Amino acid sequence: MPRIDDELSPLQLNRFQQLRHFLTIEGLSRKHLTDILDTADTFIEVGSRSIKKVPLLRGKTVANLFFEASTRTRTTFELAAKRLSADVLNINITTSATSKGESLSDMLRNLEAMAVDMFVVRHAQSGAPHFIAKSVTPRVSVINAGDGRHAHPTQAMLDMLTIRQHKHKFEGLKVAIVGDILHSRVARSQIQALNLLGAEEVRVIAPDTLLPPYIDQFGVKVFSSMKEGMRDVDVVIMLRLQKERMEGALLPSEQEFFRLYGLSQDKLALAKPDAIVMHPGPINRGVEIESAVADGPQSVILNQVTNGIAVRMAVMSMAMSGQIAELTADEEVA
């Protein structure tokens, strides 16, 4: 695994071992993850209220800094912050001063001068949220909304919440992650979370060209065949082919990929009868999954989207609580 995580682990916790930033799954305890899931559970019903608000971040300002395109992640972070009663800034990177040559550090300093309390960051460069978390003052928390190939911890946690809702526990579960493992920050975070939460077996199914060279360090079983890898699994997680990150001819064609690794009803029949089907989105129908499966009775893909709001509410509220606890302790010492 990339060693960015060695520095991230202590950085994201305060002196009381509470979340201060949320940058990666690596280095957190099972209790940290279950606390996030349990907190998210309490926020799910907020979405069904006539007034979808709780006051936990009232008076706080959250800035969404998305240096990569996003629909679901950016929108659910915005909804999460607003449902927590925060003020939200959506920074348009293409029209911001960074497009005129302003450095990221200067941009952050200016936003801090405006008393922004939290940055939600998506960046193409692995480790960018880590750099930002190290750079900001103690009055700012940083949430990683996906960095390069490195990590996407909130996506992993909304996936864990979805699995727990449908399977009730992680012990005894066999989970298959299928597709572009090489370029997927989602897969890395999912694998870390599943292993930490006690899944019996995590499988990855992919052609050799879409596996990272250090896959043996992930704590997974590797399969090159759907016929073998799908057998008797409880959960199937399909991944998007990340063509924007691919260099060279890693695939003969999308049609050939679907024939070998796309999830059809025939391939899904190899899994357990009550297996659930997941996908982090966006879906490429007919490439990694066929419509009959994506829209079928075993699909929980839209459930994942709904859970994304609750999980991001949980992470943001917990990080803010960790920030406040640290600041309060510092003031008492002073």
From Swiss-Prot:
Q: What GO biological process terms are annotated to this protein in UniProt?
A: 'de novo' pyrimidine nucleobase biosynthetic process; 'de novo' UMP biosynthetic process; amino acid metabolic process
Q: Which PROSITE patterns match?
A: CARBAMOYLTRANSFERASE (PS00097)
Q: Which residues bind carbamoyl phosphate?
A: 72-73, 122, 152, 155, 281-282
Describe the reaction catalysed, as an equation.
Answer: carbamoyl phosphate + L-aspartate = N-carbamoyl-L-aspartate + phosphate + H(+)
Annotated GO molecular function terms are: amino acid binding; aspartate carbamoyltransferase activity
For binding L-aspartate, which residues are annotated in this chain's numbering?
100, 185, 240
Q: List the disulfide bonds.
A: none
Q: What is its EC number?
A: 2.1.3.2
Role of this protein: Catalyzes the condensation of carbamoyl phosphate and aspartate to form carbamoyl aspartate and inorganic phosphate, the committed step in the de novo pyrimidine nucleotide biosynthesis pathway.
Query: Could you give the subunit structure recorded for this chain?
Result: Heterododecamer (2C3:3R2) of six catalytic PyrB chains organized as two trimers (C3), and six regulatory PyrI chains organized as three dimers (R2).
Q: What PANTHER family does the record tag this protein with? A: ASPARTATE CARBAMOYLTRANSFERASE, ORNITHINE CARBAMOYLTRANSFERASE, MITOCHONDRIAL
What's the name of the protein? Aspartate carbamoyltransferase catalytic subunit
Give the organism, scientific name. Answer: Hahella chejuensis (strain KCTC 2396)
